[in-house]
C-alpha cells in the first residue's frame, strides 16, 4: 500500500522531515512488522533549480527568436540566461536551472553559449522539472513556468515572491512529497488504510495518534 508521508503523519504528533528521520521511520516500521518496501522522494532528482526573478529581457543580437535575460537568483550579481521562450517577461518569477544543475530524466544543464552569447543555465517549463502542468491551476507547457500565472500563487504578495528568490523550486511548488510503499499482509487488515498506518506509525515511534472526528449532518 502506498502512503504519502505528509498524510500519514497528519493524524499524529510526529515531526519527521529529514532523510535520516524518514529512514528511521521506515526501519522501525519494518522491525515492528509493517514492512516498508520502498521510500520514494518525489522531486529529489531535481538539483540546483531555484526561483529566479527576471530583471531584463533583450533580443539576441544574432537570432530572431532568442532572448537574453538577466535574472536575480539571490546572489551578489544577476546571472544571464538565453532562452527561446516567447512568454518571458520582466518581473516574472521562474524556475532557473543553474550551471551544473540536474533536471528531469537526469539531464545535466551546463553554462555555455547560444549563438555566441553566454548563457549560465536554463529557465524551465513544468515538464523540464518533472511536473505535470495539469496538477496546477492555469498550468501549461507553453513556454517557461511563471509562478505568478499559477492559481496557487494568485494571492501571494510581491514581498512573498521576493522572499523565495534563490530557494529550491520543488519545495516552493509543494512537489517534494515523500511516498512510502508498505507491504501489508492479510493478517494486518487494520493497516489497509491511511488511518491504520498512521496509528501504527505513532505507536512505533512513541508518538500520539489522533483519530479524526467525522460529523454527519
Regions found by a protein language model. Give the residues of each.
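Phosphate-backbone binding interfaces of nucleic-acid-interacting proteins
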Residues: 1-215
Amino acid at each position: 500500500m502506498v502512503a504519502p508521508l505528509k498524510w500519514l503523519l497528519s493524524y499524529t504528533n510526529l515531526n519527521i522531515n529529514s532523510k535520516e528521520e524518514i529512514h528511521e521511520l521506515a526501519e522501525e516500521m519494518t522491525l515492528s512488522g509493517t514492512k516498508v518496501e520502498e521510500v520514494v522522494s518525489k522531486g529529489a532528482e531535481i538539483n540546483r533549480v531555484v526561483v529566479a526573478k527576471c530583471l531584463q529581457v533583450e533580443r539576441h543580437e544574432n537570432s530572431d527568436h532568442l532572448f537574453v535575460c538577466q535574472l536575480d537568483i539571490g546572489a551578489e550579481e544577476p546571472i544571464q540566461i538565453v532562452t527561446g521562450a516567447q512568454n518571458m517577461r520582466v518581473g516574472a518569477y521562474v524556475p532557473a536551472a543553474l550551471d551544473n544543475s540536474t533536471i528531469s530524466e537526469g539531464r545535466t544543464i551546463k553554462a555555455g553559449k547560444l549563438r555566441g552569447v553566454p548563457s549560465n543555465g536554463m529557465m524551465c517549463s513544468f515538464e523540464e522539472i518533472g511536473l505535470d502542468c495539469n496538477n496546477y491551476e492555469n498550468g501549461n507547457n507553453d513556454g517557461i513556468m511563471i509562478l505568478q500565472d499559477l492559481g496557487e500563487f494568485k494571492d501571494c504578495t510581491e514581498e512573498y515572491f521576493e522572499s523565495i528568490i534563490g530557494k529550491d523550486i520543488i519545495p516552493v511548488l509543494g512537489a517534494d512529497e515523500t511516498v512510502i510503499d508498505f507491504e501489508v499482509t492479510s493478517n494486518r487488515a487494520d493497516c489497509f488504510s491511511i488511518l491504520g498506518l498512521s496509528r501504527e506509525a505513532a505507536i512505533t515511534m512513541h508518538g500520539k495518534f489522533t483519530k479524526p472526528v467525522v460529523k454527519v449532518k
